[in-house]
Structures are given as C-alpha cells and as structure tokens.
Amino acid sequence: MALWGGRFTQAADKRFKDFNDSLRFDYRLAEQDIQGSIGWSKALVKVNVLTVEEQHQLEQALNELLVEVRSNPQAILQDDAEDIHSWVESKLIDKVGNLGKKLHTGRSRNDQVAVDIKLWCKQRVVELQESVRNLQRHLVQTAENTQQAVMPGYTHLQRAQPITFAHWCMAYVEMFDRDYSRLTDAYNRMNTCPLGSGALAGTAYAVDRDSLAHDLSFAFATRNSLDSVSDRDHIVELLSIASLSMAHLSRFAEDMIIFNSGEANFVELSDRVTSGSSLMPQKKNPDACELIRGKTGRVIGSLTSMLITLKGLPLAYNKDMQEDKEGIFDALDTWQNCVDMATFVLDELKVNVERTREAALKGYSNATELADYLVSKGVPFRDSHHIVGETVVYAIEKGKGLEDLTIPEFRQFSEVVGDDVYEILSLQSCLDKRCAKGGVSPLRVAEAIAEAKTRFA
C-alpha cells in the first residue's frame, strides 16, 4: 500500500518501484518505527486527535506487531510495501481497521524516518560501546599476562627502544578508549527528538514535543523543523567514529600480522582464527587480522559516500537521503564484527617471550641509553648523540652489541665511559629508566593495568 497515491492517475512503473522502494534494507528500522508510532499515538491523545481508548487499542496492536517483528524480522521482506513506514501502517490497519489510518495525522515520513534512524543509532551506540569495552578488557588481560615479555619497540618499522608486550597492549587500550568516548559524545549530540517536525515546517497540531521526546527516551526535542528532517549529522559522525576506530583496528591487525610472521615469530595466532592454503600444506595464514585490515576501506568508503551524498542537498528532505541507511547499517555491522574478531584473536594468543627478548637485544635499541649515560657524565646531548652514532657504526663493523664492547673500545669515542656503563645498557635498565607517567617501566605499566582494570570493572 503506497501512502501517496491520491495525486496520481497512473500506477508507478515496476522498474521505478523496484528502484524507489527501500523496504529491503530499512526493514531494520521496524522496531524503532513501531516505538515512534506508539509515542506519536500518545501525543495525538493530548491534542484530541485520538481518544484514550483509541490510543490504547493502537498501542496494543503495535506492541503485538513488535513481538512479531522481534520473532522473525526477515518475514517483513516477503511484503511488497514501499518502505518500513508503509509496512507498519499496513499491518496496523490489518489489526485495527480504519483506526490505523488515523495514526499518521500530523506526521510525515520525513520526521518519522528521522526519529527512526536516531533511535536505531542510539541503540547501536550502546551495543558498540559494549563491544569496544570488551576488547579493552581483553587487551588489559593480555597485558597483565605479558608484563615480562620484553620486545623491540619500533619507529619507521626499525628497532628503536625496548618495550614490553604489555605496554604495546595498553597503547591500544588508550586508542579504543578514545573511540568509546567519541561514541558517548555522539550519543549526547544525537539525543534530540525530531518527531513532530512534520515534512519540514512543523506539525499543524500543537503536540507537546518535549513530552514526546521524553516518552521516546530523548533528552529533549529538536529546535528547528527544517534542520530536524534534513539532519544526518549523527550518521556522518558515527561513520567517522567507525572509520577512525577501524583505522585503530587495522593498525592492531597489521602489528599482529607482522608479529606473527616467520621472520618475527613474536606471537602465534590460534588455529581458530587462521586458515590454510589449498596448495601449500604448511601455511597458517592470519586471515582474521587480514580481513580486519581489509574491511577498513569498506567502512571509510561509507563515510566518504555519505559526505558526498549530503554535500549538495538543499533544505530540507530529498530522496537522496534514502541512501543514508545501507552505508550506516553495513559500516556499523562491519565495525562491530571487526571489534569482536579482534577480541577473539586475543583470546588464545601466544606470545613467544624468548623470541621477543632475543629481538629486543638486537638492533642497538639501547643506544639512547648510552647517549643519556654520556649526558650524565657532562657531555652535551647533541655531542653525545654524535658520539653514540659513531660507536654504533663501529659495533656494527665488529659484529658486536653495544653491551659487548670493551672499555678501551668505548674510550675510542669518549674518555668519560667507565665500568658503570654496562649496567645502564641492560634491557632491564632501559625499561626501568622510562619511569615517567605513561612510560614503559614495569612499575608504570603495572599501574596502568591496575587503573584500567578498575575503570573497566
């Protein structure tokens, strides 16, 4: 049943109907459309469009429909309705007859879909935050279990300074904490109710929109009807958050792929998140991580698509805005699936502590400690930096680590070097010295883990 047929003398061509209809994807808004309709029915009682008895009858029928939708949402797709709003109204009329035709009084599909998508986005924010927090908890648990796993830290993918696997885990805890916080901010901004804005100029019925907003669990009503029906900022914002978080997940996945490589051999991924080769029987491929990395472009693409769709639209509603749904549905589903898969990857991750330590001992990652040591002996840092660079070149030529050089060898480059240099060149000293807040010292990492466990409890 179309909601707009009276103006037309010809039926829509099937090709146009197939092109125009959105039920195949906006059926996902069924619960929100029903919730919004219940709220609207209560508002219509207060302006004498519906009696209390009529409202109760409508609410009962809508709640029955809600139960049906929750039990089998896919059944909606068997219908020929144009969109989810048409489907709900048609089913309501089937249940209560002509009374169902009164519900749309004073309401437009423009404000109806606006409230539906906001309700859906609010619900998804809560679900996404649960997944992000769960990933953070797994990262913290992994960190707690790997505090003794010393490994190289990298810049430019070159060994830089020693860190621990725990410190690496906690870096991602911080990234995902910002994603969690952004979701909270987005929720607060989208927590305004557009219902009652009509097609664009507001409704002709003096509904109490603030009361309606509270009935639908919004903080307050939107302030401008034109903006209300054309606003898709919340979709863009969620797509932006999803894109940034996927970038974080992609970096996590890339690190894991490198750490899992035969060349690094820092970690071993579980058989449950890897796959084999149809040709090479020895292969164990990090497909879970590769797919997380690969799906990042898909989510970022949805953000780009939405921005391009919106950029040239005049106020207020335009049918272009129907294109908002498939992108946000797919992007948030993909994001949550990737968050959950990253959590699963951590579940049975094995860290090769001996191998990470062996790698940390190579690459002259204690060179900065030698430079700081020279500074403590009165050598200006810029000079000490140059001296250590020359010392490293010498050590490379000799095939030695800095800690393996003799005092006479050190003194070829600086006379201030004494026997106390060896203590500061040890891995443990390298870690212990990084004791400022946020540093890699075991004490600071343990504090960060304890604080995060308390925060996420």
UniProtKB/Swiss-Prot annotation:
Segment forming the signal sequence: none
CDD domains in UniProt: Argininosuccinate_lyase (cd01359)
SUPFAM superfamilies the record matches: L-aspartase-like
Record-linked Pfam families: ASL_C2, Lyase_1
EC number(s) per entry: 4.3.2.1
Record pathway: Amino-acid biosynthesis; L-arginine biosynthesis; L-arginine from L-ornithine and carbamoyl phosphate: step 3/3
Highest taxon listed in the record's lineage: Bacteria
Cell inner membrane in keyword set: no
Keywords assigned by UniProt, alphabetized: Amino-acid biosynthesis, Arginine biosynthesis, Cytoplasm, Lyase
Reaction(s) this enzyme catalyzes, per UniProt: 2-(N(omega)-L-arginino)succinate = fumarate + L-arginine
Cellular component terms per the entry's GO annotation: cytosol
Location of the protein in the cell: Cytoplasm
GO MF, one annotated term: argininosuccinate lyase activity
Primary localisation category: cytoplasm
GO biological process: arginine biosynthetic process via ornithine; L-arginine biosynthetic process
Family recorded in the similarity comment: Belongs to the lyase 1 family. Argininosuccinate lyase subfamily.
Cross-referenced HAMAP family: Arg_succ_lyase
Protein's UniProt name: Argininosuccinate lyase
Species the sequence originates in: Haemophilus influenzae (strain 86-028NP)
Organism lineage: Bacteria, Pseudomonadati, Pseudomonadota, Gammaproteobacteria, Pasteurellales
Designated gene of the protein: argH
